[in-house]
């Protein structure tokens, strides 16, 4: 009888972390990476955990959600965070790395682990036996076809079209009202009413705002049925007034009158700490995006926890398909990790790899799989991607809005974040002890 091993497909941030976590638990790993035999349009080397965009892993302080996530990962012996700490370069309050040294450090740590065997080949069929799929946003065509067959075509997406998400506490509730169009069903939307003058000012800012240049392999995105709000706007004002900003059936209960235009906000998570801007998928750069959003009545001081994005990205409908263990619901020995699960960002991808790898190892060891507490960043991210609204699921990054609210409301943002961070780290410490 052959020794049990776990397959890990993809040696990006998530796959490298998953392989490391499994190997550290004494289990053999077969790690498959198609580069350099087959390159993606974004990668340039054969190194593991190659950072293809920025060299920053974002904020490092505990008043920053991704900083808290990193600290949780440090306490779980993350190879990605350990390597980043060793290869860091000065970057103020952020953790930035020398990208070549960082990729080299991760590659060496994982390749040289006695329990890891690396195969340089493209996987075109999902293997039998315990497997972690961590193939990232540029999953190969052959494997995408396999995933389509596995999950069903309607549950596999090839691009992000994410609208901005706002912290509920930062919305001026005196300027907005709760109502559904024509009062159908429960009042599920917050509505931001605009006068004609406010709309004109917003419209001019929107059509003149700077957008992110498209990469060659992303240019097909807009033709797949999802139009950025600024592209829609450039077709004329009426496109918005008859589209996402349509005021019909949304009379303001304070005045009894129909506003000139309305921006709708839809609840984004079960606890109601986050709202997304309906129909506002966008390709605007983040600075101009914030300026445009803050022209919307009620959102003058909006805290944006996830900016609108549109780019090439292969990901699955995790709320329908995954458990918070990152385990596939219909096949208990199959796990997904990284951006393919709908987490967004370098650190978040590695974090998903950590949890998936940990649980794949526990499955092989016949141990109970772990679900991290939702008071931790690791747990709140797993909770979000597996409980978000499956009808309009879009990738999410780490942010404090994912955590359950504190028992006592703290108005000062810095103090609130510090308190949430303290609770998260206490939770992870207690949880790790029990594991």
UniProtKB/Swiss-Prot annotation:
Protein's cellular compartments: Cytoplasm
Reported cofactor(s): FAD
InterPro entries for this protein: FAD/NAD-bd_sf, MnmG-rel, MnmG-rel_CS, MnmG_N, TrmFO
Source organism superkingdom: Bacteria
Entry keyword annotation includes RNA-binding: no
GO cellular component: cytosol
Major site of localization recorded for this protein: cytoplasm
Protein's name according to its UniProt entry: Methylenetetrahydrofolate--tRNA-(uracil-5-)-methyltransferase TrmFO
Annotated source species: Halalkalibacterium halodurans (strain ATCC BAA-125 / DSM 18197 / FERM 7344 / JCM 9153 / C-125) (Bacillus halodurans)
Name of the gene: trmFO
């Amino acid at each position: 009888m052959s020794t049990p091993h776990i397959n890990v497909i993809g040696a990006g941030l998530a796959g490298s972390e998953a392989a490391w976590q499994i190997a550290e638990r004494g289990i053999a790993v077969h790690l498959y990476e198609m580069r350099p035999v087959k390159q993606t349009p974004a990668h340039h080397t054969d190194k593991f955990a190659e950072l293809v965009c920025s060299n920053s892993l974002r904020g490092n302080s505990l008043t920053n959600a991704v900083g808290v996530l990193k600290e949780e990962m440090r306490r779980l012996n993350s190879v990605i965070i350990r390597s980043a700490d060793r290869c860091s370069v000065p970057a103020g309050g952020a953790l930035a790395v020398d990208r070549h040294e960082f990729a080299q450090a991760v590659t060496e740590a994982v390749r040289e682990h006695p329990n890891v065997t690396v195969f340089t080949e493209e996987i075109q069929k999902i293997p039998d036996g315990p497997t972690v799929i961590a193939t990232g946003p540029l999953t190969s065509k052959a494997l995408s076809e396999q995933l389509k067959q596995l999950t069903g075509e309607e549950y596999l997406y090839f691009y992000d079209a994410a609208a901005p998400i706002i912290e509920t506490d930062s919305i001026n509730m005196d300027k907005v009202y709760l109502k559904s169009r024509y009062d159908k069903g429960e009042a599920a939307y917050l509505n931001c009413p605009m006068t004609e003058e406010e709309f004109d000012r917003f419209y001019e800012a929107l059509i003149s705002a700077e957008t992110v240049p498209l990469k060659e392999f992303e240019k097909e995105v807009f033709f797949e049925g999802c139009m950025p709000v600024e592209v829609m706007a450039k077709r004329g004002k009426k496109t918005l007034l008859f589209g996402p900003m349509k005021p019909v059936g949304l009379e303001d209960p304070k005045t009894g009158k129909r506003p000139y235009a309305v921006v709708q906000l839809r609840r984004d998570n079960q606890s109601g700490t986050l709202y997304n801007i309906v129909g506002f998928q966008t390709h605007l750069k983040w600075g101009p995006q914030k300026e445009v959003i803050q022209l919307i009545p009620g959102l003058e001081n909006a805290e944006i926890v996830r900016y609108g994005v549109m780019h090439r990205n292969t990901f699955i409908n995790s709320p329908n398909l995954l458990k918070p263990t990152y385990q596939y619901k219909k096949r208990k020995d199959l796990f997904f990790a990284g951006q393919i699960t709908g987490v967004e960002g370098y650190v978040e991808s590695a974090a998903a790899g950590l949890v998936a790898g940990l649980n794949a190892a526990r499955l092989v060891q016949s141990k109970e799989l772990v679900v991290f507490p939702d008071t931790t960043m690791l747990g709140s991210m797993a909770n979000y991607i597996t409980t978000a609204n499956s009808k309009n699921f879009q990738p999410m990054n780490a942010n404090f809005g994912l955590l359950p609210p504190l028992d006592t409301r703290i108005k000062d943002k810095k103090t609130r974040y510090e308190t949430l961070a303290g609770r998260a780290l206490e939770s992870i410490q207690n949880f790790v002890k029990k594991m």
